[in-house]
Amino acid sequence: MTRMKKHLRRIALILAVLFALGVLAAAGTNAVVMLSAKRYFLSNEGAAQDANFDAIVVFGCGVTAQGAPTYMLRDRLETAAKLYFEGAAPKILVSGDHGRSDYDEVNVMKRYLIEKGVSSQDVFMDHAGFSSYETVVRAKEVFLCERPLLVTQRYHLYRCVFAARAAGLEAFGVCAEGPV
């Protein structure tokens, strides 16, 4: 084998090992997040029975060009409204992107909740919820939540609960999964 081929083979092996290590690191990090957050997941019934939360926090996830919540966002809002009416928390904090004048998740979210019968006075809007982390930090620092109930889909809830707990909140989460 020529010297060049040996050299290329060695480089390929090093790259393969580095790639495998990267995959293992990502999988390990994901496992830590999931295992540490899952114990703070509640069922809808469990959240309503606890009923000791400052607010229900709903994470934005898009609105249509017509100004309606996306299917996933509707699931989150429906779950939040149900929890609110069951007495899980006295307030709902909707958090999402309103960084441009032509895109406004939070007002769409608030309007949807009001149409479902939630009192306008009980819905607070975080117009700067550009990421899950920013949402939980702002829930604590701006909206003074100490014990929020986070509502989003399961795949996203692990990260949200983990971030909230890391930020010092006594956060719990409820999965928004399909029609409530």
Stretch-by-stretch model annotation:
Residues 2, 8-9, 75, 146:
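Short, intrinsically disordered low-complexity segments
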